[in-house]
Curated annotation (Swiss-Prot):
Catalytic activity, as annotated: a UDP-3-O-[(3R)-3-hydroxyacyl]-alpha-D-glucosamine + a (3R)-hydroxyacyl-[ACP] = a UDP-2-N,3-O-bis[(3R)-3-hydroxyacyl]-alpha-D-glucosamine + holo-[ACP] + H(+); UDP-3-O-[(3R)-3-hydroxytetradecanoyl]-alpha-D-glucosamine + (3R)-hydroxytetradecanoyl-[ACP] = UDP-2-N,3-O-bis[(3R)-3-hydroxytetradecanoyl]-alpha-D-glucosamine + holo-[ACP] + H(+)
The organism of origin for this protein: Escherichia coli (strain K12)
Gene3D superfamilies: 1.20.5.170, Hexapeptide repeat proteins, MurE/MurF, N-terminal domain
Function, as annotated: Catalyzes the N-acylation of UDP-3-O-(hydroxytetradecanoyl)glucosamine using 3-hydroxytetradecanoyl-ACP as the acyl donor. Is involved in the biosynthesis of lipid A, a phosphorylated glycolipid that anchors the lipopolysaccharide to the outer membrane of the cell. Prefers (3R)-3-hydroxytetradecanoyl-ACP over (3R)-3-hydroxyhexadecanoyl-ACP as the acyl donor in vitro, which is consistent with the structure of E.coli lipid A that contains over 95% (R)-3-hydroxytetradecanoate at the 2 and 2' positions.
Effect on the protein of changing residue 276 to A: 30-fold reduction in catalytic activity
Family under the similarity heading: Belongs to the transferase hexapeptide repeat family. LpxD subfamily.
Result of altering residue 239 to A: 1000-fold reduction in catalytic activity with very little effect on substrate affinity
Protein name: UDP-3-O-(3-hydroxymyristoyl)glucosamine N-acyltransferase
Lineage: Bacteria, Pseudomonadati, Pseudomonadota, Gammaproteobacteria, Enterobacterales
Site (Involved in determining the hydroxyacyl-ACP selectivity): 290
Phenotype when changing residue 41 to A: 30-fold decrease in affinity for UDP-3-O-((3R)-hydroxytetradecanoyl)-GlcN and 5-fold decrease in catalytic activity
Active site residues per record: 239
């Protein structure tokens, strides 16, 4: 279990310490579950009333909240961001031994950097290059001539097809498949003719991809995931999609082929986005958005009808279904009124 003096933690976080710097911090916890040795954080003033009951040894908070502190405190401008950084310092995620499991199958032509770890039953094919400190989990498959940059980690049972490039310090969770064939077919009088998918997938640095997500290889050009992109679980990224730097994609999103998304976008969960179009930088699509046309202006976009009681929803749906007829009737009435005038 990691541990650190509160004063040392404050220094690493560039936080202002109030209280005993010799307190030993052993973990991060919520305000409700924290015990002695834990540090917690407060991001909303409405939780001030809970500070008296909180048993944490220290709390991360803003200057405005400091008068309400009942324990040692670290004062920062952004408690939530500080929480993320101190959670990294006190991370308890298991780290594998820096070795290669006897059951791993590694082609003789593969190039392995220093301190590479390869888990049981993993397969590394010919021409693969693994950078320094790469971790390949048990049961992973890395196809021919693929490259994985230094410090990247594949959790168990990740599949990386041939000719894929993954940058440095990336994290890919279990069950994800990168580089499978895109959905490319031509129709010959009712019969589907497969189009070989000869593009690649290029993933930048510091990319994180959740569990059971699929990123298809390009048909001709490459599918590209920019630097700093984060993609949640169970997303489908079709062939030739380009996602710009530092864009965030929540769970269950489906992106059709040849879509281009700009930088610093946020795509809400379960959204569906049409292909062969562009979304500009700094666009937010709220959850379950259906994006059928290009977006050319930054901003927040939504679609669909939010949850309603069923009886109300049925009436709303009926109104929507009849809106064209009602519009025609209204225009007809307007013409009659104008004629009377």
């Amino acid at each position: 279990m990691p541990s650190i003096r509160l004063a040392d933690l404050a220094q690493q976080l560039d936080a202002e310490l109030h209280g005993d710097g010799d307190i030993v911090i052993t973990g991060v916890a919520s305000m409700q579950s924290a015990q002695t040795g834990h540090i917690t954080f407060m991001v909303n003033p409405k939780y001030r009333e809970h500070l008296g009951l909180c048993q944490a040894s220290a709390v991360v908070m803003t200057q405005d909240d400091l008068p309400f502190a009942k324990s040692a405190a670290l004062v920062v401008k952004n408690p939530y961001l500080t929480y993320a950084r101190m959670a990294q310092i006190l991370d308890t995620t298991p780290q594998p031994a820096q070795n290669i499991a006897p059951s791993a199958v590694i082609d003789a032509t593969a190039k392995l950097g220093n301190n590479v770890s390869i888990g049981a039953n993993a397969v590394i094919e010919s021409g693969v290059e693994l950078g320094d400190n790469v971790i390949i989990g048990a049961g992973c498959f890395v196809g021919k001539n693929s490259k994985i940059g230094a410090g990247s980690r594949l959790w168990a049972n990740v599949t990386i097809y041939h000719e894929i490039q993954i940058g440095q310090n990336c994290l890919i969770q279990s069950g994800t498949v990168v580089g499978a064939d895109g959905f490319g077919y031509a129709n010959d009088r009712g019969n589907w003719v497969k189009i070989p998918q000869i593009g690649r997938v290029i993933i930048g640095d510091r990319v994180e991809i959740g569990a059971c997500t699929t990123i298809d290889r390009g048909a001709l050009d490459d599918t590209i995931i920019g630097n700093g992109v984060i993609i949640d679980n169970q997303c489908q990224i079709a062939h030739n999609v380009v996602i710009g730097d530092n864009t965030a994609v929540a769970g269950g999103v489906i992106m059709a082929g040849s879509l281009k998304i700009g930088r610093y976008c946020m795509i809400g969960g379960a959204s569906v986005i049409n292909g062969h179009m562009e979304i500009c930088d700094k666009v937010t699509v709220t959850g379950m958005g259906m994006v059928m046309r290009p977006i050319t202006e930054p901003g927040v976009y939504s679609s669909g009808i939010p949850l309603q009681p069923n009886k109300v929803w049925r009436k709303t749906a009926a109104l929507v279904m009849n809106i064209d007829d009602m519009s025609k009737r209204l225009k007809s009435l307007e013409r009659k009124v104008n004629q009377q005038d």
